[in-house]
Swiss-Prot record:
Topological category with respect to the lipid bilayer: Single-pass membrane protein
Protein name: Photosystem I reaction center subunit XII
Localization (cell): Plastid, Chloroplast thylakoid membrane
Record Pfam families: PsaM
GO cellular component: a single term: photosystem I
Family assignment from sequence similarity: Belongs to the PsaM family.
Keyword terms, alphabetized: Chloroplast, Membrane, Photosynthesis, Photosystem I, Plastid, Thylakoid, Transmembrane, Transmembrane helix
Domain of life: Eukaryota
Residue stretches spanning the membrane: 10-27
Keyword Cytoplasm carried by entry: no
GO annotation (BP), single: photosynthesis
């Protein structure tokens, strides 16, 4: 089991937020 550092958690959260926002934008564009 590997120890996850705070920086890795922050990077994962930011990447998840970015991908979520991009997915929402893509969904809205396709919905139109």
């Amino acid at each position: 089991m590997t120890i996850i550092s705070d920086s890795q958690i922050v990077v994962a959260l930011i990447s998840a937020l970015v991908t979520g926002i991009l997915a929402l934008r893509l969904g809205r564009e396709l919905y139109r």
